[in-house]
Amino acid sequence: PYALKALPCVLIWFKIVWEQLTLDFSEPLHRPKTLPGKEEAIDLILPCYNPQEGWERLMIEKHAELVKMLKGRSLRFIVVNDASKRGFTKDAVERLLEALPDTMIVSYDTNKGKGAAVRAGLSHSTSSITLYTDYDFPYEADSICRMVEWLESGYDVVIAVRNHTYYTHLSTRRKIMSYASRILNFTLLGLTHTDAQGGLKGFNQRGKSFLASTQVNRFLFDTEFIYKASQESDVLIKDMPADLRDNVHLPNMRRGVLAEELKNLFLIAWRG
């Protein structure tokens, strides 16, 4: 009987949480556009760890596709080798640089994690608009171009929000972890932009400062980035629905990641 009496309260709580998870809290724009100069390239950071064979050919193809869609804007790749044990070969790098000589290669000998790799690439970015995504370009090129347009319109940070197509590519374990992370982002960190783990984000110079100040080296660096940016009331953050490319494979996370990232989540909340 007591459980039945409590049921309406539980349903109301779930309704409130769902509304918070799905609302767009972005503020209207009141700033001038922050267009990159004609001589300035948009920087795209691409962290790599043990990339699949042919990764450099995919980058060359995607660069050509993106430049065509970006309508005259130039684009520079910043490729970060996070101490790969295989795949990131000298021949592959030479082929990439021959086709795209403006590409910057950042490499080091100790594996540090995706967060550290993105920050390493960020330290070499000089553009007023910078993005990062995975080396295998899981998102459609159109999503990347739309992100650039939102940043040019004045947003400080733009987040790729994963739609239903993303979750069809996930294993049951990853689905549970993704949904759980959104709930924890809201309940523990108070984030209204709860989908912080999508692998595509963009930012201007102001947004760059928040990413540069993160400390998490692995999975939850995205969450720390959005948490830091959301602490400033005048920072403009945009949630942008994004589509995955066809035939994208999203691997399972290794064992122990959940416990490690729960610890990082509490550290983010503790450090504030």
Regions found by a protein language model. Give the residues of each.
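A conserved acidic beta->alpha catalytic loop
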Residues: 81-92, 137
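Conserved donor nucleotide-binding strand/loop of the catalytic core
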Residues: 90-124
